[in-house]
Swiss-Prot record:
Record key words, sorted: Oxidoreductase, Peroxidase
MF-aspect GO terms: lactoperoxidase activity
Protein name according to UniProt: Peroxidase
Organism ancestry: Eukaryota, Viridiplantae, Streptophyta, Embryophyta, Tracheophyta
UniProt entry tagged with the keyword Oxidoreductase: yes
Length: 14
């Protein structure tokens, strides 16, 4: 998963 806003993968910077 890549950093940033939440994606369809359900990961990201929160």
């Amino acid at each position: 998963a890549m950093a940033g806003t939440a994606t369809v993968q359900g990961q990201g910077t929160r």
